[in-house]
A protein has these predicted regions:
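Transmembrane beta-strands of outer-membrane beta-barrel proteins
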Residues: 27-35, 68, 72-76, 105, ...
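Outer-membrane beta-barrel proteins
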Residues: 40-44, 83-86, 116-119, 184-187, ...
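Transmembrane beta-barrel outer-membrane domains
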Residues: 49-53, 87-89, 154-156, 185-191, ...
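Structural signature of outer-membrane beta-barrel channels/translocons
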Residues: 61-65, 99-101, 164-169, 197-201, ...
Length: 362
């Protein structure tokens, strides 16, 4: 048994056998399991059949009533890799926090407000499976610390402090700062991420901003702006997002890229149909090199992705699904599937994938 799995079992055993300190405290075990069988092909890699794990996780969360409208709470969440029998204790959203009349503050390893602003409310595939929007939007997912995965604006961030305001007339403010634990003699990298969201009935609107300081080197600054929207009318929802990323690979060079998404979900009694179209514009600037999937300025560096999905609910917690995705890179770009990327991604590759799977919440 791996150390991480043994540690998880030990933690569960301790919680199950430990004393209950107060009636106002609670601990809950929960999770999500999702896997599918996929056929994927692309120029330069041929084709392959594979089983894919789609962000399955196991988690514990707890809360304690402190009185006066205040509470303390925690979460420990780790990836479970169904297809290869492995897992980790706390490599997903893991934090401890306190909340009250003025909002809540958490500290730990957490998704950024920038990612969360369109993750569930806008993307029909929840930035998961081969249909996920973060193949292009955000320039690929990365979990880690400052200056690591410096290409990504779709992040789970280490050493982070996260504030969520109370909701006022549908408006909620979120802000995160990731401390520069990775500081060196010449570089002090840090991250600031924020989002303002509005929910009222069938309407959702969001604006998010994120800034990476000294990720590529001393004095560099990378920024992301993202807007999102969703409107639901009966069983039909129309969704969209637009994003502007600007990188400074060196203090004297920059690379800017726009991308947008248009998506829809049609919800029936026990099933749903999903569609998403994403387009990345060609990069501009004076950088002679690309960043992540984004190609260098001055080359044919656009891309498109279309994704189709169908989900059938067997119960409130279990669903069967099918997903199709086609990711079309121009000659100067190398975008990849963000969830379960393929190993070979030469510039200009077109990836086509189809999967059938099952998801279960508990």
């Amino acid at each position: 048994m791996s150390t991480s799995r043994a540690g998880l079992l030990a933690a569960l055993a301790g919680i199950c056998s430990g004393p209950v300190w107060a009636d106002t405290s609670s601990v809950t075990l929960f999770g999500y399991l999702n896997t599918d069988i996929e056929y994927v092909r692309g120029l330069g890699m041929g084709s392959l059949w594979r089983e894919a794990n789609n962000l399955s996780f196991l988690a514990l969360k707890g809360t304690e009533d402190l009185g006066g409208g205040w509470r303390a709470f925690f979460q420990i969440q780790g990836n479970i890799f169904l297809n290869r029998g492995a897992g980790n204790l706390a490599d997903r959203d893991t934090y401890v926090g306190i909340g009250g009349p003025y909002g809540q503050v958490t500290m730990g390893y957490q998704l950024t407000p920038y990612r969360a602003s369109t993750w569930l409310p806008v993307d029909p595939f929840f930035m998961n499976t081969i249909g996920g929007a973060n193949s292009i939007i955000g320039n690929g997912f990365f979990p880690g610390g400052n200056a690591q995965g410096n290409f990504s604006f779709d992040r789970r961030q280490a050493n982070s402090v996260f504030y969520t305001s109370p909701t006022w007339h549908g408006l909620t403010l979120q802000a995160m700062y990731s401390l520069p634990n990775e500081k060196t003699a010449s570089q002090t990298p840090s991250l600031f991420s924020s989002a303002l969201t509005f929910r009222s009935g069938a309407v959702y609107l969001s604006y998010a901003y994120e800034q990476h300081n000294s990720y590529f080197g001393p004095g560099t600054k990378d920024t992301g702006h993202r807007v999102g929207a969703s409107y639901t009318y009966g069983p039909f929802s129309l969704r969209g997002a637009a994003e502007r990323l600007r990188f400074e690979p060196t203090p004297a060079t920059y690379l800017t890229r726009w991308a947008w998404q248009l998506a829809s979900v049609y919800q029936l009694a026990s099933s749903s149909f999903r569609v998403s179209y994403i387009q990345a514009q060609a990069a501009t600037g004076n950088s002679p090199t690309g960043v992540g999937g984004i190609g260098a300025a001055g080359v044919d560096s656009g891309a498109r992705q279309i994704a189709l999905g169908y989900e059938y609910n067997l119960s409130k917690r279990t669903a069967l699904f099918a997903v199709f995705s086609r990711l079309m890179n121009k000659s100067g770009t190398a975008y990849n599937y963000s969830t379960n990327p393929v190993a070979i991604t030469p510039t200009g590759m077109t990836l086509t994938g189809f999967g059938i799977g099952i998801g279960h919440n508990f």
